[in-house]
From Swiss-Prot:
Residues 11-31, 52-75 have a biased composition (Acidic residues). Component of the eukaryotic translation initiation factor 3 (eIF-3) complex, which is involved in protein synthesis of a specialized repertoire of mRNAs and, together with other initiation factors, stimulates binding of mRNA and methionyl-tRNAi to the 40S ribosome. The eIF-3 complex specifically targets and initiates translation of a subset of mRNAs involved in cell proliferation. Component of the eukaryotic translation initiation factor 3 (eIF-3) complex. The lineage of its organism: Eukaryota, Fungi, Dikarya, Basidiomycota, Ustilaginomycotina. The gene is NIP1. It comes from Mycosarcoma maydis. This is Eukaryotic translation initiation factor 3 subunit C.
């Protein structure tokens, strides 16, 4: 029949044939099918004439075909009364064979239930990839749920999970991280339903990755090798009897190559039928050079580079080769993530950390090799052995270990900045800090053994950054996990882990780290030295050593030039000032605490100044997207944040204990009323006073405002109860001692406020009555009254015999108060007129200075001099130069 259809295909007839004939012809000959048919007579003549060139077998088959056609034509003529035979009669002879062929073809495409499940999963994965192109997170969520149900069915049936599932999970994780990074940088945020779907997808994907972390890590290290191995395993498990007819030849060849890769030493299968060179020790340098030349190019596959370098490290048979390959491998891992916002995958980060540990340990065992940033030129493709071929006793390899340590630490910080701090993922990631700390200590020991001063200073600063803001128990836990890192290199500059485990060990460690940085010399050491001082002060303030921290702060004179420092150092400076304020509050030094916190709260941007949040964008904002991006990169990880609610609570309570007596002292005196200690507190208090109805306190600020009102009314018990009910105290170390201290201070402030407010209504008052009213010891009352009299705050005198306080009436009358106000306004008008006169007569200033003048004579005989201001902002300390200088002056006062 094949010869028959080949000849019919050469005809020029014009009628169509059925689709079954096309399939049959495609299977038999592969030639183009006939489109039309001829009448029976002409068709038989054509076939007879065209059989001359065929062999005998073809002739026989053609004759048989012709006979069948003739008989069919005869039957057709009888049915159609001599008319032309229709196409269906021509197809009659081929119909039977077509039916049999179609049955065979149906058998070929029949798939098992297992294959159908695999195809369904592949279809779902394709849908997910299509939805990624349009960022349709709702569809991705739906398809992902269907995919996970299919995977669960596979596991229930104890069947192998296809490799494309792990590929899809890895690609989806990478796409999710990129989308999250773009969303942070985007000016226009995505819609709420899309963002909700994206966050839901993030949680689902995190759970799946955690359940399959080992398999996904193997896939990411060698994607194509993983797929080839999975296909080989799947083929071996299936082992169909008719593999040659059921599977395409190309796929069989790839599977056979994967199964027989050991038979050929020159090539190995990496997937998709591709082949790569098998790396050998002899060709290592050549392969390494080729890999390094491709580094940074746009078409370079970074995963493929990492896989090749990992294979090269396995065939390196000398320390020099091992060092060269690991240096290139770590650099390639850090090149994997080129984005400034997204962070390295955790698996990739951990692999880089292990390789850094490996190369440092290798350099520690082979002291004849060192890694330096600046070395003499050498041939990269030649083995270098110490003392041979013109080499020195110590072979220097070009590289930078400290840069790897810095990048590793930065990537760890970047990951903490991008992970949601309220999830378990953040806690799991934070547990990796002890591994990072071990790597830093190991590198620090190596730099100390090599006497590399600059690298040692940078590594010491990194170590200090990880301990200065932690409590003693956490520092001891970090030091206890060092293990081999402490044994590999014994340090003579810093205390051992055994010494740190003692009671004062953490303080000794921080002091040793800071002392080494203090002694560093050179311009490059200026920044680490400044940061070391600030870290040391922060550590003392964190441990409630207020006077030590204050003295170090003032003696360092950092406040004079901190505006010239970099932004990160200024952020650390702000954190130190705030921590000093908290430390003063814990020690009961209310005034010092308020002064330390005053400046940063006066700005209204506490969160931004402490790098714990970015400024909110509004119509008046001048922050560009680039500046906002830099601010986000400088944000501190969540576990290093200072609780802003606790900080505000401390500031408001300190302001309350200072402002309430000050407001009572001012009374109706217009001059004293201008003395404001805390303007933010005054604004909050005024807002509270304007409220028609005040409900029960709901937050920290409400508690403090109502406590302030109770204190103004002399109700100390209600004030103490409101302050004690604040829930944020549980975050304060030694909260019970702080509450007792505050109760005592509130009683004392209540007594002062009472005396200021009601002294005008008494001629004398008993000390015992005051002690009983405010629940204070009589000796304390006597001491407080004596101090108030000495400071001219209270016009009174003590009568020891009668044990009373006698008040003197020195209040101004209403006329006297109005006269004082008039004098003040007249003085201000005079000063304003003098400034206007100076502005108009500015061109004649030299003549007035030389010849004197009426105004100069009025100024005590000093020609041309300006009149000294009486009172005003200079006398009241309200000039623009207040702020930080006043703060440090207050910090330096004796307590």
């Amino acid at each position: 029949m094949s010869g028959f259809f080949r000849k019919v295909g050469d005809s020029d007839s014009e009628s169509d044939i059925s689709s079954s004939e096309e399939e049959l012809s495609e299977l038999e000959s592969g030639d183009e099918q006939p489109k039309t048919t001829q009448p029976a007579a002409s068709r038989s003549r054509f076939l007879k004439g065209s059989d001359d060139d065929s062999d005998s077998d073809d002739d026989d088959s053609d004759d048989d075909d012709q006979d069948s056609l003739d008989s069919d034509d005869d039957n057709g003529e009888r049915r159609t009364d001599g008319k032309k035979a229709p196409t269906s009669r021509f197809m009659k002879g081929a119909a039977d064979s077509d039916d049999s062929d179609s049955e065979e073809e149906v058998k070929k495409v029949v798939k098992s239930a297992k294959d159908k499940r695999i195809d369904d999963m592949q279809t779902i994965v394709n849908h997910i990839e299509s939805a990624q192109k349009s960022s349709d997170w709702t569809s991705i969520n739906k398809d992902f749920d269907n995919l996970m149900r299919s995977i669960e069915r596979q596991r229930t049936l104890n069947e192998q999970i296809p490799a494309f599932f792990y590929k899809a999970i890895s690609q989806l994780d990478q796409y999710l991280n990129e989308s999250a990074a773009k969303e942070k940088d985007a000016k226009k945020k995505m819609k709420a339903p899309v963002a909700k779907a994206m966050n839901g997808m993030k949680q689902k994907l995190k759970k799946v990755i955690k359940e399959n972390d080992e398999t996904i890590a193997r896939y990411r290290s060698d994607p194509e090798g993983f797929e080839a191995a999975a296909e080989a395993a799947l083929s071996a498990a299936a082992a169909p009897a008719d593999a040659e007819t059921a599977i395409a030849k190309g796929k069989k060849e790839r599977l056979a190559a994967a199964l027989d890769s050991d038979a050929n030493d020159d090539f190995q299968t990496v997937g998709r039928g591709g082949r790569t060179e098998t790396f050998t020790s002899e060709g290592l340098f050549k392969s390494l050079t080729a890999i390094m030349e491709a580094r940074g190019k746009k078409s370079t596959d970074k995963n493929e580079q990492i896989r090749k370098l990992h294979d090269l490290s396995g065939v390196a048979d000398s320390p020099y080769k091992k060092i060269r390959v690991i240096l290139a491998l770590v650099a390639a891992r850090f090149d994997y993530n080129a984005s400034a916002t997204a962070y390295m995958p955790v698996e990739m980060w951990d692999s880089a950390r292990k390789e850094i540990n490996e190369i440092v340990a290798l350099l520690g065992k082979n002291r004849s090799y060192v890694v330096r940033e600046e070395t003499e030129d050498y041939d990269d493709e030649v083995e270098r052995v110490p003392g041979q071929n013109g080499e020195k006793d110590v072979v220097a390899v070009r590289g930078s270990i400290i840069s790897f340590v810095d990048r590793l630490d930065d990537e760890f910080t970047k990951s903490l900045q991008n992970i949601d701090p309220h999830t378990t993922e953040y806690v799991d990631r934070l547990c990796d800090e002890k591994k990072l700390y071990e790597t830093i200590v190991l590198a620090q020991g190596y730099f100390e053994s090599q006497s590399e001063t600059e690298a040692l200073s940078r590594c010491t600063m990194r170590r200090l950054d990880h301990v200065y803001a932690k409590q003693d128990v956490i520092i001891k836990a970090l030091e206890s996990t060092l293990g081999e890192a402490a044994k590999t290199f014994e340090s003579k500059l810093f205390p051992s882990a055994v010494r740190v485990a003692e009671q004062d060990g953490p303080a000794v460690l921080v002091r040793a780290l800071c002392t080494y940085l203090y002694q560093a010399r050179g311009v490059q050491a200026e920044r680490p030295r400044t940061r070391a001082v600030l870290c040391h002060i922060y550590f003392h303030a964190l441990h409630a050593d207020y006077h030590v921290a204050r003295d170090m702060f003032l003696m360092s004179h950092l406040q004079d030039a901190i505006q010239l420092a970099d932004v990160a150092t200024q952020i650390l400076y702000n954190r130190v000032v705030v921590q000093i304020g908290i430390c003063a509050f814990r020690n009961g030094l209310i005034k010092e605490s308020q002064v330390a916190l005053q400046e940063i709260f006066a700005t209204g941007r506490v969160k931004e100044l402490l790098a714990q949040g970015v400024q909110k964008q509004n119509q008046f904002s001048t922050v560009t997207p680039e500046q906002e991006k830099l601010e986000r990169q400088r944000q501190l990880p969540f576990h290093m944040h200072i609780n802003l609610e606790l900080l505000e609570c401390i500031y408001l309570i300190s302001s309350m204990l200072l402002e309430v007596p000050n407001m009572a002292l001012a009374g109706n005196d217009p001059e004293l009323r201008k003395r404001v200690i805390s303007r933010p507190f005054r604004r909050m208090l005024d807002y509270t006073d304007r409220q028609v109805f005040s409900g029960p306190p709901e937050n920290t600020r409400d508690h403090i405002m109502q406590a302030c009102k109770a204190l103004q009314n002399g109700d100390c018990k209600a004030c103490i109860e409101l302050i004690s009910d604040i829930k944020i105290w549980k975050l304060m170390p030694g909260s019970q001692e702080v509450k007792l201290m505050l109760a005592k201070r509130i009683q004392e402030v209540g007594l002062r406020t009472y005396l200021f407010s009601y002294s005008a209504y008494y001629e004398s008052v008993s000390l015992s009555h005051l002690a009983a009213t405010f629940d204070v010891e009589e000796t304390v009352v006597k001491a407080m009254v004596s101090k108030m009299i000495y400071n001219d705050e209270l016009a009174a005198s003590l009568d020891p015999s009668a044990n009373v306080v006698s008040f003197h009436r020195l209040e101004l009358t209403k006329v006297q108060q109005l006269a004082a106000t008039l004098a003040e306004k007249a003085n201000s008008m005079l000063e304003q007129n003098e400034r206007l006169l100076d502005a108009k007569l500015g061109e004649g200033k030299e003549q007035r200075s030389g010849a004197g003048g009426e105004r100069g004579d009025r100024e005590g005989g000093q020609p041309g001099g300006r009149r000294e201001r009486r009172g005003g902002s200079a006398a009241r300390g309200r000039g623009r130069g207040r702020g930080r200088a006043q703060q440090f002056q207050a910090l330096g006062q004796k307590v």
